[in-house]
Amino acid sequence: MSFDIVELATASYIFMAMQNKPGHHEFLYVSKLAADSPIRVVADIAARSRSANQRRGITGLLIFDGMHFCQQFEGSGAEVAALMERIRQDPRHTDVAILHQGPLAERRFRRWSLGYTSVEDVEALARLERLRGQAAVEAFTGMVAGLDLDP
């Protein structure tokens, strides 16, 4: 796992800025499963995250394509900023890239402490990885609309 100084400074700034902001906030990021992590750790990540997210009031959706993670999560500013920092430090994730972060008027995934699905199209997440800001959110939302997620 490697981060340049700008990424670390940006993450620190985001964390500090979101600590005391009221309302909901969201993060959308992509990362890769570390080469030395067996694919079975993904089930462990999902199970542990569901429990932890429920305690912290975080909701969201995790998509995995066999190599890439893409996740959108939402909750209080302090909680989602802390979660993003834990993900950045998690050795099972590499090449963590924040595609979007900011205030959120209404939760998108209020039904799930962590919804999880996999996709077979490995290029879908790779294409998303190149986007930032609202374009990334719109592409992610469009991808989610095409997934078979249980109600």
Which residues does each PLM region occupy?
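Charge-rich, low-complexity N-terminal segments
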Residues: 2-151
